[in-house]
Amino acid sequence: MASRIVTREEMLQRVARFKELTPSSRPLVDAVLPQFNRQIFSIIGGGVTEDASMKVPITAVDGFHLSIIKAGPKKGTGLHNHRTVEVFMPLTGTWSVQWGDDGENELTIGQWDVISVPTGIMRGFRNESAEEAYLLALVGGDDPGRVAWATNVMSAVREKGFDLDANGKIVEIGR
């Protein structure tokens, strides 16, 4: 069977140059909380981001979404769940991954290690390094759906004056 023909122009639409990416500083609603402050570079597909202004360079999604997370020391994400597998690989630094309804389970992964977090469980991650670090993240599926946040995370977010609208995007609600 002959392969299909893809032009250079078509292939260029599937290239993302890191130096040209603009990260979101509020990629998900939990980032309004200091301990979850981080940036996300969405590269292939929008993943589960809740930032309506996020620009994604590669919009052709073929079964997965790819992003890079940049976080300072002890920064990460709040406990959350979504309907797809999530895969993490530290590009730099050391990261912890938590899982369980209260994040009661935890393990640490280092540069180039990989963890595949299964569906149906709360999960979170944190940069355990003394310096800023990068984490590669893949979310499975063409449509990974929306994030389901732990109750305590959403309560803290609302106390800061933020919430999610009907489309799952971040909105300011005031205090």
Language model feature labels by segment:
Residues 81, 85-111, 121:
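A short beta-strand-loop-beta hairpin characteristic of the jelly-roll/cupin
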